[in-house]
């Protein structure tokens, strides 16, 4: 096994410094990020078809409209004026719930499936309906856990 002497170590150090100083810095193009590209197969010995002419891309550069609208950095008032979207339920859905998907069963509360859903949904909101659906869907797993002796 060869040992390194002082001359070879200094030569290695100098070559690393020179290599790092003359390396080309990494640079991106104009902010276009390629998120997906179709790979086109080709036979060995034949030239490739080239890059995908229609790659899936995203443009990271802000457009001139955005730059003009913001006028620079966003302030606290800009963030305070953003709506949470909570009023869209009243604007799109009648009475705030989806017709036909409400949790109220009318006068007959012992209808089909009422035993599985009784008391599990919280109100007439869409969130309550989704929560009730998830609980009904997970009921078989809860039953398996009860058979195994796991207490909820």
UniProtKB/Swiss-Prot annotation:
Explain the consequences of disrupting this gene.
Deletion of just fapA in an overexpressing strain yields less dense fibrils around the cells. Deletion of the entire fapA-fapF six-gene locus shows no visible growth phenotype.
Compartment(s) of residence: Periplasm
Q: For this UniProt record, give its keywords in alphabetical order, as a comma-separated list.
A: Chaperone, Periplasm, Signal
**Could you tell me the superkingdom of the organism this chain comes from?**
Bacteria
- What's one GO-annotated cellular component? periplasmic space
Instruction: Please list which residues make up the signal peptide.
Output: 1-28
Domain description: Soluble monomeric FapA is predominantly disordered.
**Record family assignment:** Belongs to the FapA family.
**Can you state the subunit structure given in the record?**
Monomer in solution. Interacts with FapC but not FapB in vitro.
Entry function:
An intrinsically disordered chaperone for fibril amyloid FapC that guards against fibrillation, probably within the periplasm. FapA inhibits FapC fibrillation and elongation of FapB fibrils in vitro. Upon overexpression of the endogenous six-gene locus (fapA-fapF) in situ, cells form large clumps during liquid growth, make large amounts of biofilm and produce amyloid fibrils. Expression of the 6 gene operon in E.coli strain BL21(DE3) induces flocculation and biofilm formation with copious extracellular fibrils.
Protein name (database record) = Functional amyloid chaperone FapA
